[in-house]
Amino acid sequence: MASKEIIFDQKARDAILKGVNTLADAVKVTLGPKGRNVVIEKSFGSPTITKDGVTVAKEIELENKFENMGAQMVKEVASKTSDVAGDGTTTATVLAQALYREGSKLVAAGHNPMEIKRGIDKAVEIIVGELKKLSKPTKDQKEIAQVGIISANGDETIGNIIAEAMEKVGKEGVITVEEAKGLETTLEVVEGMQFDRGYLSPYFVTDAERMVANLEDAYILIHEKKISNMKDLLPLLEQIARSGKPLLIVAEEVEGEALATLVVNKLRGTLHVAAVKAPGFGDRRKAMLEDIAILTGGRMIAEELGLKLEQVSLKDLGRAKRISIDKDNTTIVDGAGQKADIEARVKTIRAQIEETTSDYDREKLQERLAKLVGGVAVINVGAATETEMKEKKARVEDALHATRAAVEEGIVPGGGVAYLRAVKALEGVKVSEGEKFGLDIVRRALEEPLRQIAGNGGYEASIVVNKVKESKDTNFGFNAATGDYEDLVKSGVIDPTKVSRSALQNASSVASLMLTTMALVAEKPKEESAAPAGGGMGGMGGMGGMM
């Protein structure tokens, strides 16, 4: 095991502070509508130009191991806030820096860090409660668009497209972001249920020009196992042929004799049929097949449910007005499922979303929910160059997260003003003498986002903060984009409450941990030993004993 280097107390806190400042100073220049750009070198390809705090934070790695620990802890603040709320990463970094900077001065002066930590925790709890009181639900599409515009660094096109997407698919719909082929950023809404499995054979295609199989008013067979034997399928195919309706087969796999027979009958015109693989894997596949069955009013054919393929009749099949299948996707529109059954299924999935602890599972459950209720919207992001495309796509994803957060927990006035207004809740709070310092640190730190926004815009930060503080109007603040003092909610400068709350909670959590740190342990750098000088071919004597 390599030997370690350990530093204690003030020396440790100074190293952390230096790391925190290095990272935060690089990140905070991006804050606000007049935030500056940061250019990041890439080992290959062109450099990345960004105004996104978390992108800058993720790139920073410091040479000094102890300073790097401080930087990495603040990076954690940015990443966590981005994961939870999708935005507010720069604000969280600014808050963490301010809390730690002020706190470390007090600890250096001999105050008890544990009392300061308790004070910070109490203050943050009160401020979060006050932010929730200040919060208002998003009323209309316009407000949702404004949240998107701010999060996308002032890009109106992005904000409006996201608001339109949310209106079309509802707040539980799935909105995905893809790269477009052209320069335009467009919105495409898929009605009904779509899953990422295409036709098993191109011979099923009905529209040769677009390479799509369209089935109108079709039956749907939902089978969880492979179908390879034709004789199991024959009784059902005879019933389908008599009914004259198209059939879609969704199964784990359709292969061999069964697939060949379907293709031959399709080409002869005896049957109008198509087959696709079931979506998902393992247990998730079973759940998705159940979803399709409920949406279309059919039954999932599974032996464990006592249903065999040869016993299936038309009443066991699902129905849909229209089915469209291309080589990658299948879309089922207007399924014949009972409304009550679909609602019961939706309720079950919602309960699972509440219970799950895995982000991945939650995302997949959310997708299933959207397919049953709302639909799916795809935002195709267009740009002129690869670099611009990456940057724009990241902004769209940020804005999408922020608008979701706004719909979830409501909005507060933006531009760092909500924090200033929430500070009044700390007046008259009864705490011990040591904890009072923690309250004061939070009080000072909450001015920092507004100071930084004003500073980045080229305005005098102290004057701006004092002018905003003087007003009793909750929504009155400084609009750095125009340089005006106005009602921020009316002028569209708003932040999702979830973003403001998460930024403060994550920043205070990490700042408190760093304040109560007394020692840092890191591996000693290995001393590179100089390579021994090459000694030529000497030393080859003494070989005479060899036979």
From Swiss-Prot:
Give positions of region: Disordered: 526-547
Transmembrane region(s) = none
**Entry keyword set:** ATP-binding, Chaperone, Cytoplasm, Isomerase, Nucleotide-binding
The EC designation for this entry is 5.6.1.7
What the protein does comes down to:
Together with its co-chaperonin GroES, plays an essential role in assisting protein folding. The GroEL-GroES system forms a nano-cage that allows encapsulation of the non-native substrate proteins and provides a physical environment optimized to promote and accelerate protein folding.
- What sort of enzyme, by top EC class, is this? isomerase
Xref: PANTHER family = 60 KDA HEAT SHOCK PROTEIN, MITOCHONDRIAL
- Has UniProt tagged this entry with the keyword ATP-binding? yes
Coarse class of the protein's main subcellular location: cytoplasm
Q: Which family does it belong to?
A: Belongs to the chaperonin (HSP60) family.
The record's subcellular location field reads:
Cytoplasm
**An example Gene Ontology CC term for this record:** cytoplasm
**Oligomeric form and interacting partners:** Forms a cylinder of 14 subunits composed of two heptameric rings stacked back-to-back. Interacts with the co-chaperonin GroES.
- The Gly residues compositionally biased stretches are 533-547
Task: Supply the gene name.
Answer: groEL2
GO MF, one term, reads: isomerase activity
At which positions is ATP bound? 30-33, 51, 87-91, 415, 479-481, 495
Chemical reaction(s) catalysed: ATP + H2O + a folded polypeptide = ADP + phosphate + an unfolded polypeptide
The entry's protein name is Chaperonin GroEL 2
Ranges in coiled-coil conformation = none
Under CDD domains, the record lists: GroEL
Q: Name one GO biological process term.
A: protein refolding
Q: Which NCBIfam families match?
A: GroEL, PRK00013.1, PRK12849.1, PRK12850.1, PRK12851.1
